[in-house]
Amino acid sequence: MLSIGDNVKFVDEFEVEYDGKLTEVLSDAHDDVRLEGGVVEYWSKKTKKYVPVKPKNEASVFFEVKTDMGMHYISKDEFV
């Protein structure tokens, strides 16, 4: 289960593996997102609560990871 503050490993587009700390979850489709119990949720104005991101918007979600080389912004598919 993925949480903010976890140490993670990921591979970039050049197949280089990095270790880092997950610092934030972001989305191009939603303003307010969070990582709760390993599930990315967004604030629904309609229901006035956090709900899981819909499959059609999963590609808009990315994660900020702090490494020794700086900050990296990665997709869910890049985690090892």
Q: What feature does the model see in each segment?
A:
Residues 1-13:
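Short coil-to-beta transition motif at edge beta-strands of beta-rich domains
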Residues 5, 17, 60:
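Short coil/loop residues immediately preceding or within conserved phosphate-binding loops
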Residues 11, 23, 66-68:
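A structural detector for beta-sheet-dominated domains
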Residues 14-16, 70-71:
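Short acidic/polar mixed-charge low-complexity motifs
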Residues 16-28, 37, 53:
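Short beta-strand-centered aromatic/proline hotspots
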Residues 27-46:
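Short peripheral tails and domain-boundary helices/loops at the edges of structured domains
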Residues 40-80:
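Intrinsically disordered, low-complexity, charged/polar segments
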